[in-house]
């Protein structure tokens, strides 16, 4: 299954983010990809108090666009869900097939300060979430489906977080996961950049090696608050397999890549 990744700017302007994601969809279509992965909060922007009406309209536009273009999407966005307990804000990866049909949703488990206002995934009650990514009606070269587990930012970096289960280990133990889809949006431009770079790189390499499950990961090119930034992303975007990077894109500005799983 050919999956593309988009290293793109994530601003607080939902309409601008929509345009950016559509351009990435176009790139993925031009490169005969089955699906596309976007960074954490790539549609909504990384602000829990997003404009709800604007976001609802933007998501509808994206869903219509992927159906028109016949490509799947793993969309990082904040979202307000209607659940049994009421309306709840979540940090999500929304998985779609190439007809614009939603296949499932991963909610972020290990929240950070930037997620203020969002509710964490109830791991104890609902367990790890596995999604079957697939293409409908359109035959493209290669595998047409794959079982994926979404890991949102700290859900991967927080592997082995004190007192908390490792989500990658839970996915491995399930025996159902073929791929980790990692959407992230990390801090950058601070005194900890060097050590954070090593931390992120080590996790992406070691988890892919220890679990023998590939990882596709994409990061935001802006600051977490959506402000422009001309330095490197907080982590590398690309694919790791068995402890090695098998794709390579610069960590500056908008970049796209794909890999055949």
Model regions: which residues?
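CN hydrolase (nitrilase-like) catalytic-core segments centered on the catalytic cysteine
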Residues: 55-75, 157-255
């Amino acid at each position: 299954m050919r999956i593309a990744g988009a290293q793109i700017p994530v601003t607080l302007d939902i309409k601008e983010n929509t345009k950016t994601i559509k351009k990435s969809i176009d790139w993925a279509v031009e490169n005969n990809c089955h699906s596309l992965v976007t960074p954490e909060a790539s549609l909504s922007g990384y602000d829990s108090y997003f404009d709800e009406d604007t976001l609802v309209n933007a998501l509808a536009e994206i869903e219509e666009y992927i159906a028109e273009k016949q490509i799947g999407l793993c969309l990082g966005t904040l979202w307000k869900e209607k659940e049994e307990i009421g309306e709840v804000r979540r940090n999500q990866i929304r998985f779609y097939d190439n007809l614009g049909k939603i296949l499932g949703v991963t909610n972020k488990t290990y929240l950070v300060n930037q997620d203020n206002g969002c509710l964490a995934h109830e791991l104890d009650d609902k367990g790890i979430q596995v999604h079957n990514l697939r293409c409908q009606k359109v035959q493209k070269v290669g595998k047409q489906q794959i079982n994926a587990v979404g890991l949102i930012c700290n859900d991967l970096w927080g592997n082995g977080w004190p007192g908390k289960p490792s989500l990658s280990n839970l996915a491995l133990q399930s025996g159902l996961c073929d791929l980790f889809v990692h959407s992230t949006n990390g801090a950058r431009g601070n005194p900890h950049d060097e050590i954070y770079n090593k931390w992120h790189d080590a996790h992406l390499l070691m988890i892919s090696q220890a679990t023998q499950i590939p990882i596709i990961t994409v990061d935001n090119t802006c600051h977490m608050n959506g402000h422009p930034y001309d330095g490197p992303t907080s982590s590398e975007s690309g694919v790791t397999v068995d402890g090695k990077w098998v794709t390579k894109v610069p960590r500056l500005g908008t970049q796209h890549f794909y890999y055949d799983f």
